[in-house]
Swiss-Prot record:
Intracellular or extracellular location(s): Mitochondrion inner membrane
Stated role: Component of the cytochrome c oxidase, the last enzyme in the mitochondrial electron transport chain which drives oxidative phosphorylation. The respiratory chain contains 3 multisubunit complexes succinate dehydrogenase (complex II, CII), ubiquinol-cytochrome c oxidoreductase (cytochrome b-c1 complex, complex III, CIII) and cytochrome c oxidase (complex IV, CIV), that cooperate to transfer electrons derived from NADH and succinate to molecular oxygen, creating an electrochemical gradient over the inner membrane that drives transmembrane transport and the ATP synthase.
Family, similarity comment: Belongs to the cytochrome c oxidase subunit 2 family.
SUPFAM superfamilies, per database record: Cupredoxins (SSF49503), Cytochrome c oxidase subunit II-like, transmembrane region (SSF81464)
Cofactor, free-text remark: Binds a dinuclear copper A center per subunit.
Annotated keywords: Copper, Electron transport, Magnesium, Membrane, Metal-binding, Mitochondrion, Mitochondrion inner membrane, Phosphoprotein, Respiratory chain, Translocase, Transmembrane, Transmembrane helix, Transport
Organism of provenance: Syncerus caffer (African buffalo)
Mitochondrial intermembrane side: 1-14, 88-227
Protein name: Cytochrome c oxidase subunit 2
Binding site for Mg(2+): E198
Major location (coarse): mitochondrion
GO molecular function: copper ion binding; cytochrome-c oxidase activity
Amino acid sequence: MAYPMQLGFQDATSPIMEELLHFHDHTLMIVFLISSLVLYIISLMLTTKLTHTSTMDAQEVETIWTILPAIILILIALPSLRILYMMDEINNPSLTVKTMGHQWYWSYEYTDYEDLSFDSYMVPTSELKPGELRLLEVDNRVVLPMEMTIRMLVSSEDVLHSWAVPSLGLKTDAIPGRLNQTTLMSTRPGLYYGQCSEICGSNHSFMPIVLEMVPLKYFEKWSASML
C-alpha cells in the first residue's frame, strides 16, 4: 500500500518484491558505508596540515583500492543476477492473461477462456465515488486469483507503453510487434494499483492499472459471470 509523502517502496505483496526489498536494503547499506568512508577521507584532507610530497607511489594502497571495489561489485552483482533469473522463470502458470497497451487505455484477454476480454479505462475525476483514488481507478479491474502463478503477456497496439505494478515488483515494456512475458503471484488479497511507466503521449498519465487479487473460489464466480 502507498502512503502520502512516502519515500520508500510500497509494501511487498509478492515473493519477487520481497527479494527486491532485501536487495535494496543490502545495496543501500553498501552505498552508505562507501559514502561515509569517502566523506571521512575528504574531511581529513581538508582539515589536516600534513602532506606527503615525497611519496611517488604506494603499491599496497593501489592493490587494496583495486581489489576491494571488485569484491564490493561482486557482492552487489550476485544477488542482483539471482533476482533477474527468478523474474524470468515461468513454471507451469495456472492462468495466462494478455494485456495490450493503447493510447490511452489497456485491454485484457484471459486466454484460458473462450471469450473473456475487456478494455480498462481510467474513471474520470467527475465520476469518482467517495473513497476512490483520483487518476488510479478504472472502469474494469483485472481480477486474478491470489497465491497462484499467473503469466502476463504484454504488448502494444500503437506506441511504447510499460505495464507496471510496484507492490508486486512488476514492470514490463509493451512494445508494438513484440510479445513480452512476466509472472506474478500475490500472497495477499486486495487492490493493487499501477500505471503506464513509459511516456506514450499526451495522456500518458491517465493509463492506470488496477489488479484485484481474490481467493480462487471468488475468481471462479467472477469469471463465470463474465462469460
